[in-house]
Amino acid sequence: MADGPAGIRLRQWYEVDKEADSIYEMGVLGSLENGILEPGVHHENADTYYQYCTAFPVGTALAQTWNADLMTEFGKAIAEEMEEFHVNLWLAPGMNIHRNPLCGRNYEYYSEDPYLSGMLAAAVIRGVQSKSGCGVTIKHFACNNQEDNRMGVDSCVSERALREIYLRGFEIAVKEGNPVSIMTSYNLINGIHAANSKDLCMTVARKEWGFDGAIMSDWNTTVPEDGSVPWKCVAAGNDIIMPGNPDDCLLYTSDA
């Protein structure tokens, strides 16, 4: 998998041990006598490979075209690079609402309009997933509308505003685009961590919208000092717990 938002975000270069008997997919990690190659460190007995990805326009710029057909073509271009670099899952697009112009990741998101956000995200999804083996992850589900204290902020929102503004774009993307996965957000929604919300993951996404793909947590969602512990994420309906607290699996998962 690879992150977004403006195309595929990969390490500029990686190395493969010249004498490795076997390597991981794409040779990102090659085996050495003392373990795997350290990324970002040059080694004498290794070949260096460079990865040049296209820097596509960011989400806000794309949305200003109001052109769903163009967004589908953009998605197809992303999928071509995914195939080239053996990436199966793109951790994008981000499609949170522009609630405040000071949000640190507004550039990544499409718009303050949930309809526009949803329709354009759906077009991108269709483009990417038109190629077999290429999938999309829409994020951050939901109400991730600021970067400052994003792991602890509580988004207090009425049911009507939640449905009509902050979830509407995701609903359209799910129903019109059928993404492979959804990534939950760090923040709380009305006092409950989004990744711990069964109402959000199971009732809304799966039962109401009919989503049948994978739901995953964001990286470091389950850090030790946070209230969003792994068993709560699993119980809420997250299928995949992304890396965070090293003791997650041993200490908590069985409690789900």
Functional labels for PLM-detected ranges:
Residues 1-254:
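Glycoside hydrolase catalytic-domain context in secreted enzymes
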